[in-house]
């Protein structure tokens, strides 16, 4: 029984450990970890002429980039057009906040916005995207994409967070 437990522990750890060297211990954070459910979603925002609802984002790393990407389903209702449903894609750079023991996104860019039942002009789409930018920035500076257990000491030892070969890597060290 003890050998079985040790074997399972080794299999688990080798799946997460990316490398161990003089920089420290580097762990790979899987997409499944990034996509754990958040109690913050769905999120509703009400504006003077429009209301939006954002569903839980699907977070992933696009090959060949050093950014984390997300696709978010959106519901939009305005005074001057019918309710619409769509998706938008965004990307941002990961950073670690030692105080909150969590990984957030900064330098967030809205890459794409599409609605299934609307054919919007490029100018109107750009206006929506520019008005949504502060909302999106606020979301990803306040809601982490990954948290280290608050009761764990690991958050104190995070040295680096980066994307390499389409993997999110967290390096722990002194």
Predicted regions, residues:
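Sec-dependent N-terminal signal peptides
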Residues: 4-13
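Extracellular/lumenal and peripheral-membrane lipid-interaction modules
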Residues: 16-174
């Amino acid at each position: 029984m003890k050998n079985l437990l040790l074997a399972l522990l080794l299999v688990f750890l080798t799946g997460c450990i990316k490398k161990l060297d003089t920089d420290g211990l580097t762990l790979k954070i899987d997409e499944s970890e990034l996509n754990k459910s958040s109690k913050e979603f769905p999120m509703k925002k009400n504006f003077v002429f429009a209301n939006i609802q954002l569903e839980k984002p699907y977070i992933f790393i696009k090959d060949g980039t050093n950014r984390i990407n997300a696709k978010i389903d959106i519901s939009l209702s305005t005074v001057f057009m019918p309710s619409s449903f769509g998706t938008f894609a965004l990307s941002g750079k990961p950073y670690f906040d030692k105080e909150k023991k969590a990984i957030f996104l900064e330098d967030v860019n809205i890459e794409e916005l599409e609605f299934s039942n609307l054919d919007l002009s490029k100018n109107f789409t750009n206006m929506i995207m520019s008005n949504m930018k502060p909302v999106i920035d606020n979301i990803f500076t306040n809601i982490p994409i990954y948290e280290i257990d608050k009761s764990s000491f690991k958050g104190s030892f995070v040295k680096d967070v980066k994307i390499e070969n389409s993997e999110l890597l967290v390096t722990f060290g002194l």
